[in-house]
Amino acid sequence: MKKLGGFDYSSLEISNRHKMNNKYIRKSIRAFPFGNDELTPEEKLFKNTFEEWYSAKHRTASNDEITFINSITIKNCPYCSSIKFIKDGIQKYKCNDCNRSFTPLTNTIFDSRKIPISEWFEFLLHLFEFHSIKTSSYDNRNAESTGRYWLIKVFEVLKGIQDDVVLDGTIYLDEMYLPKIKSETVKKNGKKLRGISNNKLGVGVATNKDKSIFIVTGTSKPSVTSTLRTYGSHIKEGSTIIHDKEKSHNALVNKLNLVSITYSSKETVGLEDKENPLDPVNNLHNLAKRFIREHGSYDRDNLQDWMNLVWFILNPPNDKYSKVLKFIEIAISSPKRVKYRDSMMKNFTK
C-alpha cells in the first residue's frame, strides 16, 4: 500500500525558490522606484508589464464564480440557524426569526471578500505543496499580510476537523516533538537540554495507513493523562497498535483492550525505511516537520491549528485539486467569518 502522503506527493519536491529569505521581496509588487510622470520607454514597459501581471493575478469575479455562488443551497440562517427564511432578491435571503438579511457567503470566510474566491485556488495549492506564506504571496502578487490573513481563515475553517476521526485495524503510533521558540528555551550551564525535554512540544501521531491523526499532547513528555487525552477518543477498541516502548501507552492499551506490539529504539535504529516497523508513522513525522520548517516562525500557541492543517494536507482526498475543492466546500458550509482587524492583532506566522 502506498504511504499516506506518499512518494508521489508534491510536497516532497520543494524547490530552492521556496526557501527565499530576501528582504527585498517584502516590498509591494507595485512599489516602483519611479513615479507616474514622464516615464522613459524602458520604465513604461517595465511598469505596464508588472501591472499586467498584477491584473492577471487579481481578477474580478468571473461568470463561473457568480454561477457557483448562485448554485449554493441555503439550509438555514447563518446568524441564528433558523430554517424559516424567505428569498429576498437574487441569492439574497431574509430570516423570519431574527429578521436579518444574508447571502450564500454571509458569515463564511468569503464574506465581504475583496478578492474573488477563485484566487483561493492558487493560494491553497501553494499551501498544500508546502510553500511558505512569504513565497506564496510573492508568487500570487499578494501582500504578505493577505497571506497571513488567509492562513488564519484556513485555521478557522479546519478547527475541530479531527474531532470525529477514529482509527481502527492496525495502527502505528508515536509522538513527534517540535522545538519551542528561542525565548522559551530552557538551558543548563548555558547549553540546551538534550533529548525529550521541556524545550519540546509534543504531538501525538497515529495512522492506520488510510487516515491519521495529529493531536497536540500539551506536554513535553508523555504521561498517562496526556496519552489518554490525546489518543483515547481516536482509536477504536480492540485495535492493534504498533509503537515504541513508551510506558504511558500501557494505559491506552488497557483502557481500549488493544493488542500491543512494541519495538524499542535499539531495535529500529539504523534500519532502512522499508524494514522499520514504525516507518508509516515516522514518514508522517518527517512530512509534518518539513511543512513546519517552511513556517519556522509559527506561533506555538496555535500549534493545534497547524496540526489540523497538516492533517488536512496528508489525509484523503490525495489529489491536490480535489483537496482544494474539498476545502472550499467545507468553508462555504462553515459559519466562520474572520474579520481582518481582529485576526491580525496577533501574528501567527511570517
What are these regions (language model features)?
Residues 2-350:
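Residue-level recognition of single "structural anchor" positions
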